[in-house]
């Protein structure tokens, strides 16, 4: 499992620890990833995702998983999020076909 947010795409960065004597040693800056369960109203199911705290805030700010994914262009979404978006669109099309 990669250390990458499935919504924002944030990943590991590298840099230096710098001591008081200005000695530098390499280090990694890890994203604050949380295993979260988001509920999709359209799918009628919960979706487990590994998101950064910034990604969780972004989804909540946009009104939930469904509205965030449907309102975001595919070029801005990582592949994992695009897969969930396609599932949501398929279910929406089926529901629209049943009502028509």
UniProtKB/Swiss-Prot annotation:
Listed SUPFAM superfamilies: L28p-like (SSF143800)
Keyword terms of this UniProt record: Ribonucleoprotein, Ribosomal protein
Pfam families recorded: Ribosomal_L28
One annotated Gene Ontology cellular component of this protein: cytosolic large ribosomal subunit
InterPro entries: Ribosomal_bL28 (IPR026569), Ribosomal_bL28/bL31-like_sf (IPR034704), Ribosomal_bL28_bact-type (IPR001383), Ribosomal_bL28_sf (IPR037147)
GO molecular function (one): structural constituent of ribosome
Family (UniProt): Belongs to the bacterial ribosomal protein bL28 family.
Protein's name in the database: Large ribosomal subunit protein bL28
Organism, as annotated: Gluconobacter oxydans (strain 621H) (Gluconobacter suboxydans)
Upper lineage: Bacteria, Pseudomonadati, Pseudomonadota, Alphaproteobacteria, Acetobacterales
